[in-house]
């Protein structure tokens, strides 16, 4: 146990940072591919976090297996947040991923990055980060709309979102994000069994 803790607390090496960067790029692509269908539809856009969480689980878990040290997941969240922001997403979308990546880092770290259950929970929490923009939308729809209009979103898209939004959609958004990311984490654990055994990751 002491060896695992010492390994976790060691600083990130150049190799770790490069690996984190590569997997962050892959993760971004998988989240984008999973969520883009929903994002382009103002009625279905609330389920973008669910779509984004459906495919990326194996990539996320493999990153943990490759770099099981503190701050790798946080750095991933910073990079993804920056990418989302500069590509025109609402600032809360970027901030949501950043905050939840840090939370996810500490959750996975609680098991020294060796627990399948905590690593999977970590991924679920990370995926919930995609709800950040929508939380702000429900909390301050007018402010959200002004920001997105400034980012180039069409008024008709926003009008349809506002007409669709209700408490049921908000609950369904969170439930769907949790369910799809849990499925993705489960599939990832099955796909990466050999890699997990090599990295010492257990139940």
What is each stretch, according to the model?
Residues 1-7, 193-203:
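Short, charged juxtamembrane terminal tails flanking transmembrane helices
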Residues 2-71, 75:
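Hydrophobic transmembrane alpha-helices
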Residues 17-22, 50-51, 70-78, 94-95, ...:
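Hydrophobic alpha-helical transmembrane segments
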Residues 24-32, 79-87, 125-135:
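Aromatic-anchored segments of alpha-helical transmembrane domains
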Residues 29, 97-135, 185:
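Short helix-perturbing small/polar motifs within transmembrane alpha-helices
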Residues 34-42, 67, 71, 107, ...:
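Membrane-interfacial segments
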Residues 35-40, 44, 80-108:
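Interfacial aromatic-anchored transmembrane helix boundaries in multi-pass membrane proteins
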Residues 45, 120-193:
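Membrane-embedded alpha-helical hairpins and interfacial helices in multi-pass inner-membrane proteins
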């Amino acid at each position: 146990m002491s060896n695992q803790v010492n390994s976790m607390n060691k600083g990130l090496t150049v190799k770790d940072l490069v690996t984190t960067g590569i997997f962050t790029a892959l993760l971004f692509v998988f989240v984008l591919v999973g969520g883009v269908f929903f994002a382009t539809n103002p009625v279905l856009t609330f389920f973008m976090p669910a779509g984004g969480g459906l495919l990326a689980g194996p990539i996320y878990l493999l990153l943990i297996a490759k770099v099981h040290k503190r701050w790798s997941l946080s750095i991933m969240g910073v990079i993804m947040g920056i990418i989302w922001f500069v590509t025109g997403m609402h600032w809360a979308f970027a901030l949501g991923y950043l905050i939840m990546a840090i939370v996810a880092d500490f959750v996975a770290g609680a098991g020294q990055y060796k627990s399948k259950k905590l690593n999977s929970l970590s991924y679920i929490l990370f995926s919930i980060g995609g709800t950040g923009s929508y939380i702000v939308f429900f909390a301050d729809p007018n402010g959200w709309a002004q920001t997105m209009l400034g980012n180039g979103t069409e008024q008709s898209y926003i009008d349809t979102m506002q007409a669709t939004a209700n408490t049921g959609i908000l609950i369904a958004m969170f439930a769907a994000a949790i369910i799809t990311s849990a499925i993705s984490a489960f599939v990832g654990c099955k796909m990466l069994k050999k890699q997990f055994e090599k990295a010492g990751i257990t139940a």
